[in-house]
Regions:
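C-terminal catalytic histidine-bearing segment of alpha/beta-hydrolase fold enzymes
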Residues: 176-224
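Gly/Ala-rich beta-loop-alpha elbow adjacent to hydrolase catalytic centers
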Residues: 102-106, 110
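Short beta-strand/loop motif that positions the catalytic acidic residue
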Residues: 150-151, 157-159, 163, 184
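Serine-hydrolase catalytic machinery in alpha/beta-hydrolase-like enzymes
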Residues: 1-95, 191-193
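Conserved alpha/beta-hydrolase "acid-adjacent" motif
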Residues: 164-173
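Short beta-strand immediately N-terminal to the catalytic nucleophile in serine-hydrolase-like folds
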Residues: 100-102, 125, 158
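A conserved short beta-strand
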Residues: 118-133
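Conserved serine/cysteine hydrolase catalytic core
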Residues: 136-153, 210, 214-216, 221-224
Length: 224
């Protein structure tokens, strides 16, 4: 079901589970909230027994499926406003504990969200560890800096070893923050969340989502 958050940002939500184990906010990839994420919200709510909400990363903008204008729009995004939307999505779930999971650009925002105590556990799928040069702006702070200021130990990073957005030196820097890193040796960027991508690897994707579920649910057994 689509809703509008208090900020005016669109989101997709499923709170149909009677007694959810926790809440889960999803930060989509650069191609925005779309049927892929509507389906993911419903599926994870059902299969993971969670209340789930995915948030539009480009609120109030009309961007087509072409990637070029989306890349061009990223520098105008504001970290504080994006985190506000993630918090509002968490509030909409009505659960005591809330986790965060994101993909690609959304995975980058997962790293940045380590500064927020609102999320008990975080899982970043192939998020950019350093902001690409074309995305840099005064409103985009470096993920590594925010991880250093926040709680990197609550973050799980799912990384493809052949992903050009997460080169080995960046992954080493990510590990140095205390972030928990799982690498898939043959995987490229975007290998897990969209089965239509050429880079999709079904076995690695299944393993990554299993690890992520276990990681997120670990928050429900940890001390507050």
């Amino acid at each position: 079901m689509r809703i509008t958050l208090p900020s005016g940002t669109s989101a997709s939500i499923d709170t149909s589970v009677t007694s959810p184990s926790m809440g889960l906010v999803i930060a989509p990839d650069i191609f925005s909230l779309r049927p892929l994420f509507d389906d993911m919200v419903a599926r994870l709510a059902r299969e993971w027994n969670m209340a789930v909400c995915a948030v539009e990363p480009f609120p109030g903008r009309r961007l087509d499926a072409d990637i070029a204008p989306r890349f061009a729009a990223v520098p105008s995004l504001d970290d504080s406003l994006h985190l506000r939307d993630l918090h509002e999505a968490a509030d909409a779930l009505g659960t005591e504990r809330v986790g965060l999971m994101g993909f690609c650009m959304g995975g980058m925002y997962c790293f940045k969200s380590a500064i927020s105590p609102r999320f008990s556990r975080i899982a970043s799928f192939y998020g950019m560890i350093r902001i690409p040069a074309d995305w840099q702006s005064p409103t985009q702070e470096e993920p590594l800096a925010l991880l250093a200021r926040g709680d990197a130990s609550k973050v799980l990073a799912i990384i493809g070893a052949k992903d050009p957005y997460t080169p080995p030196a960046d992954v080493a820097a990510l590990r140095d923050t205390g972030c928990n890193v799982v690498e898939y040796s043959e995987a490229e960027h975007g290998f897990a969340h969209d089965s239509q991508r050429p880079s999709h690897r079904a076995a690695d994707a299944e393993d990554a989502f299993t690890r992520t579920r276990e990681w997120l649910l670990g928050a429900t057994t940890s001390a507050p």
